[in-house]
From Swiss-Prot:
Key words of the record: Repressor, Ribonucleoprotein, Ribosomal protein, RNA-binding, rRNA-binding, Translation regulation, tRNA-binding
GO cellular component: large ribosomal subunit
Family annotation (PROSITE patterns): RIBOSOMAL_L1
UniProt superkingdom: Bacteria
Pfam families: Ribosomal_L1
HAMAP family: Ribosomal_uL1_B
CDD domains from the UniProt entry: Ribosomal_L1
Protein family per UniProt: Belongs to the universal ribosomal protein uL1 family.
Signal sequence, start to end: none
InterPro entries assigned to the protein according to its UniProt record, in alphabetical order: Ribosom_uL1_bac-type, Ribosomal_uL1, Ribosomal_uL1-like, Ribosomal_uL1/biogenesis, Ribosomal_uL1_3-a/b-sand, Ribosomal_uL1_CS
Function: Binds directly to 23S rRNA. The L1 stalk is quite mobile in the ribosome, and is involved in E site tRNA release. Protein L1 is also a translational repressor protein, it controls the translation of the L11 operon by binding to its mRNA.
Lineage: Bacteria, Bacillati, Bacillota, Bacilli, Bacillales
Gene Ontology BP terms: regulation of translation; translation
Organism: Geobacillus stearothermophilus (Bacillus stearothermophilus)
Gene that encodes the chain: rplA
Protein name, as recorded: Large ribosomal subunit protein uL1
Length: 233
């Protein structure tokens, strides 16, 4: 376990590790326990009762945060002709086809999200071994393989975030910055929680949401009582 600094240890004293806090209280604690000297990201981790090894219990999707993440994503779109023009008009940072495939194969990664039209996936598929491990491969489940490239770009720029269950059954999602108003962080949290409830696989048995933790960059984790979140289930 890495050695923790004095500020972190002082922040940790403010947290009751055995308690699951109401979301409003948890957000307040995240701000009080933030030890970073920059505008830290606030992230939520969900431990879900699923077996990711089973194909029918895979969870992957995307949700538009009502107040964004505090960061504007750089979007690369693989498209041709009119669709390329639509992507450019919508605000995509990079639009093209084979030239960007070649750049990525040579180690270029100045982007955060990749969108592709379905007709481009034959070519983009060549990048699977490069983009896949980085979580950047376009996927219909996240709305990043689509002919409606304008909508995809606009949603991503507005604060759309992807989520994907890892091998241990966890999902990590950024919900904003510590500088955000508490209410905005709570509403972003609720949007993510509602999306995950809707994404529950039919094959999942037992307790679905096992544990929820909210934290800031470099700050301690704070358990959240998800029943205090008002969402339409």
């Amino acid at each position: 376990m890495p050695k923790r600094g004095k500020k972190y240890l002082e922040a940790l004293k403010l947290v009751d590790r055995s308690k699951a806090y109401p979301i409003a209280e948890a957000i307040e604690l995240v701000k009080k326990t933030n030890v970073a000297k920059f505008d830290a990201t606030v992230e939520v981790a969900f431990r879900l009762g699923v077996d990711p090894k089973k194909a029918d219990q895979q969870i992957r999707g995307a949700v538009v945060l009502p107040h964004g993440t505090g960061k504007v994503a750089r979007v690369l779109v693989f498209a041709k002709g009119e669709k390329a023009k639509e992507a450019e008009a919508a605000g995509a940072d990079y639009v093209g086809d084979t030239e960007y495939i070649n750049k990525i194969q040579q180690g270029w990664f100045d982007f955060d999200v990749v969108v592709a039209t379905p007709d481009m996936m034959g070519e983009v598929g060549k990048l699977g071994r490069i983009l896949g491990p980085k979580g950047l491969m376009p996927d219909p489940k996240t709305g990043t393989v689509t002919f409606d490239v304008a909508k995809a770009v606009q949603e991503i720029k507005a604060g759309k975030v992807e989520y994907r269950v890892d091998k241990a059954g966890n999902i990590h999602v950024p919900i904003g910055k510590v500088s955000f108003d508490n209410e905005k962080l709570a509403e972003n949290f609720a949007a993510v929680y509602e999306a995950l409830i809707k994404a529950k696989p039919a094959a999942a048995k037992g307790t679905y949401v096992k544990n929820v933790t909210i934290t800031s960059t470099m700050g301690p984790g704070i358990k959240v009582d998800p029943t205090t979140v008002a969402v339409a289930q």
